[in-house]
């Protein structure tokens, strides 16, 4: 599209990707230049073997706006990714115009430091075979379908199979 830029940023659930915005991209493109970013390790982006931290995502957002969009932009962001955009805006105010937050997670719930149990869990999940096994169990086809039926579907008897497939593929 043509017009002022809008950057779309997906939620940070395991299958999160730019596909989340598919139903509104064309409408937004009638009046805006639309950018749909898959954050590092998500969707169609490379899934390298690094530990993805909040800083990595904040930097990726700022770099994308600077190097790809090249001007102050509006951002529409979903779920857990809201905190990354808020921090990116805090760090580099000149890159952002308006921010629309869809289903934001409470920032106060995100400020907690990991305790001993969380640190142990992280170490266990970083063990190559064990961590991969647990991850694939969490994002198996059945687990994704159940998650959609129980938590995401407006009509659980007629789930959006294309969205489920996109979520599953983005997680793998």
Residue ranges of predicted features:
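Structural signature of beta-strand start/N-cap positions in the alpha/beta core
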Residues: 5, 31-33, 72-74, 95-98
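Active-site signature of alpha/beta-hydrolase-fold catalytic machinery across serine-
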Residues: 23, 87-91
